[in-house]
Amino acid sequence: MPSCDPGPGPACLPTKTFRSYLPRCHRTYSCVHCRAHLAKHDELISKSFQGSHGRAYLFNSVVNVGCGPAEQRLLLTGLHSVADIFCESCKTTLGWKYEQAFETSQKYKEGKYIIEMSHMVKDNGWD
């Protein structure tokens, strides 16, 4: 599967697969299964989201994440085009990327990522 381009934009684009390490001086979120870095705390937008299997966080950008094909899903906030995202290291499905929101009030989610809390842990400097 192609990697998900972590930059802004509505499309999941193939990119070179590699493992990124976030600076140790930053509070980070990592995959609970393999400890691959996923996101910096500074990229967290909201803690008030619901994933398929429980609470989830919305991030502006992520690393070490690949994505599947986009599909339309009727979510709690309306119809969206989303692509499942997975950890590039252990291949665990983590959540999804919002490709397109069909309701004007939900457009802010486009290009953003949902990661379920059950699939991530806090690392570095949370004391």
From Swiss-Prot:
PANTHER family: PROTEIN YIPPEE-LIKE CG15309-RELATED (PTHR13848). Residues 27-124 form the Yippee domain. It comes from Homo sapiens. The modification Phosphotyrosine is found at residue 98. InterPro entries: Yippee, Yippee/Mis18/Cereblon, Yippee_fam. Widely expressed. Detected adult brain, lung, colon, small intestine and ovary, and in fetal brain, lung, liver and spleen. This is Protein yippee-like 4. Belongs to the yippee family. GO terms for molecular function: metal ion binding. Keywords: Metal-binding, Nucleus, Phosphoprotein, Zinc. Pfam families: Yippee-Mis18. Zn(2+) binds at residues 31, 34, 87, 90. GO terms for cellular component: nucleolus. The modification Phosphothreonine is found at residues 92-93. GO terms for biological process: negative regulation of erythrocyte clearance; negative regulation of erythrocyte differentiation; protein localization to plasma membrane; regulation of cell shape.
